[in-house]
Regions:
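Catalytic core of membrane glycerolipid acyltransferases/transacylases, capturing the structured
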Residues: 1-48, 56
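Non-catalytic C-terminal accessory region of glycerolipid acyltransferases
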Residues: 53-165
Length: 165
């Protein structure tokens, strides 16, 4: 995950631009704040559980908005995404909103974004609520749901690596 991932995904999904959570500190940077607001970002306090933002995100999904979320919750340049820990927020939000999930994988050489480095955007098939909750049996298991969704995202990267050989 890199700082420009939301911009790349917005460009790839032009028909329905997703909104994004961004750490609240970014909204105090004079040049950056207007740009991220224009991309539909809204602030989140990462120092603890920001219940207001979670509820806002659930409501946005319930009302048909697209929301881009990153299961890892932070950037780890140069690290294979499949080896990174996953946070439970994505699972909690998606299961409470009964949202369909569109997995997106950004493939870049060495897992590091760079100026003029080519990026391949791989968009998978939507994951319905019934699938990631096991027919509703795992509805409250946010950690499981986040890991399941993230595994489906990582599969996109693995499948594309297999095709390149």
């Amino acid at each position: 995950m890199s700082a420009i991932d939301p911009i790349i995904i917005c460009a790839a999904t032009r028909r329905q631009q997703p909104r994004y959570m961004a750490k609240k500190e970014l909204f105090s940077v004079p040049v950056l704040a207007p740009c991220i607001k224009a991309l539909g970002a809204y602030p989140v306090d990462r120092s603890g559980a920001d219940a207001g933002v979670v509820l806002k995100t659930v409501h946005m999904l319930e009302n048909g908005y697209s929301v881009g979320m990153f299961p890892q919750g932070t950037r780890r340049p140069g690290v294979d995404p499949a080896t990174t820990p996953v946070r439970s927020g994505v699972g909690f939000i998606c299961s409470h909103a009964h949202a369909q999930v569109l997995p997106v994988y950004l493939k870049v050489r060495g897992n590091k974004m760079g100026f003029l480095r080519p990026v391949r955007v791989i968009i998978g098939k939507p994951i319905p609520y019934e699938e990631y909750t096991g027919g509703g049996e795992r509805e409250g298991d946010a950690a499981y749901i986040s890991k399941y969704i993230f595994s489906r995202i990582c599969e996109l990267g693995s499948e594309s690596a297999g095709k390149a050989k």
